[in-house]
Amino acid sequence: MIKRRFFNAFVLLLLVTGALAQNVTTDNSFRIGRLKNGMTYYIRHNNKEKGIADFYIAQRVGSILENPDQRGLAHFLEHMAFNGSKNFKNTDASPSIVHWCEAHGIKFGTNLNAYTSIDETVYNVSAVPVKNPAVVDSTLLILHDWSHYLDLDDKEIDKERGVIHEEWRTRRAGMASQRLMEQALPIIYKGTKYEDCMPIGTMEIVDHFPYKVLRDYYHKWYRPDLQAIIVVGDVDVDQMEKKIQAVFSSIPMPANAAKRNYYPVNDNDKMIVASLKDSEQPIMLVTLYMKRDATPDAEKSTIRYQRDGYVDDLIAYMVGERLDEMQDRNPKPCLSASARIGQFLVSRTKDAFTLSFGVRQENIKGSFDAAIGT
């Protein structure tokens, strides 16, 4: 089945070669629009679950945009989004977002959640019972408040400092991969914004930042031109579009808005080598990256970009097949081996061919030579 899929992809490559600069046709089942304030929305109806829909607000905002005195605040802000807003105050008259959602069967941590990464922050309210119009309206109001109307109360900020600190402690205590990544980034990304950009930030700043610094970050970067509303599920697309336009059009776009930059990654004349150790990492892993520039966003709607994606998949698949054949030897030269082509670690502005393999302590050079020789 897999080989047939890649054969079909190869045939498709031959067919589209003459139309590479053309844009891919948009799926008509998607409703895509942009409000006057710059906010984009995407709506799609499906019948996967009757009477259920998922709601998202996605933001092109992450820890890479933090100043040195803001390290960790993109992630901190994500936590604060559940601790009071214009229409969800956590009072008897105005329940919190969490209380309102759970009262309607939307579980916090499962259907109500968020994540912060280097370049994006995404909030979701999923498995929403949409047959009740009032529930739909309140769900959109949650996204509306996340966009621009968080309270960011002093007392709530201080309470959340301890929560973040415990999350940081737990991650460092139980996640060797997290600690190794923190060691690797300053070496691999030396001299770039990416050398210190992990969303968890630094606890010195989390424990002591002034309230105003968090509010400044929020109002600088949480704005319509960097946000998108996404609704997918058992909804009437026309009605949902009207609701989105009514709820989100009034959110203001700040004057003299800061430019949202995407930061480059330096090329290197000599190979960069990072040798990392952690007591909880029992297997020696070797990863080889061969970098290349990422495709500009403006070109990602073209047939050329789609074709190049198929080519990358074919290359990674064929190398993977060679690695599997190598692992059939007795004894196996590597403990594990894999190949992929995609984003270079945490940076959107670079892609890479990545070859990863686990090596035997007693035969490091032999494992390395076998994997590279494929």
Residue ranges and their predicted role:
Residues 84, 125-160, 326, 344-374:
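M16/insulysin-pitrilysin zinc metalloprotease superfamily fold
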Residues 228-284:
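An aromatic/glycine/proline-enriched structural segment found at the starts
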Residues 23-32, 123-126, 133, 183-227, ...:
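Histidine-acidic residue clusters that define the catalytic metal-binding segment
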Residues 93-99, 151-169, 236, 255-269, ...:
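Acidic/histidine-enriched alpha-helical segments
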Residues 149, 156, 161-162, 169-173, ...:
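Non-catalytic, conformational "gating/processing" segments within enzyme and secreted inhibitor domains
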Residues 286, 293, 305-374:
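Structured mid-domain segments that build the active-site/substrate or prosthetic-cofactor binding neighborhood
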Residues 1-23:
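Bacterial Sec-dependent N-terminal signal peptides
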